[in-house]
């Protein structure tokens, strides 16, 4: 089951990247990892650095995708984002945290993307 979930996650991230590129976002990094955690997609639009968490579901048994980006997950993403900003030497850059929900249909190739901009903030 873990392999299937990993495959679904990778597929969903690919769909999210294509969606972002189609909507004029420049992809800077994907699956950025360090000892603090991982960020799915890091992109830029105009002067804004956007940190994207991708969540997918093929049913609602476990709730909406965005519901899994709880407070603890948000804190983890923020820590990794701060470390990325320091690593890339991007001081004083404006940052936005987005969630992209990917709804998959296992019986067809249909899918739906819901892009939640500014899903959470640095506090």
From Swiss-Prot:
InterPro entries: Restrct_endonuc-II-like, tRNA_endonuc-like_dom_sf, UPF0102_YraN-like. Belongs to the UPF0102 family. Signal peptide: none annotated. One of its GO terms (molecular function) is nucleic acid binding. Pfam families: UPF0102. It comes from Clostridium beijerinckii (strain ATCC 51743 / NCIMB 8052). This is UPF0102 protein Cbei_1183.
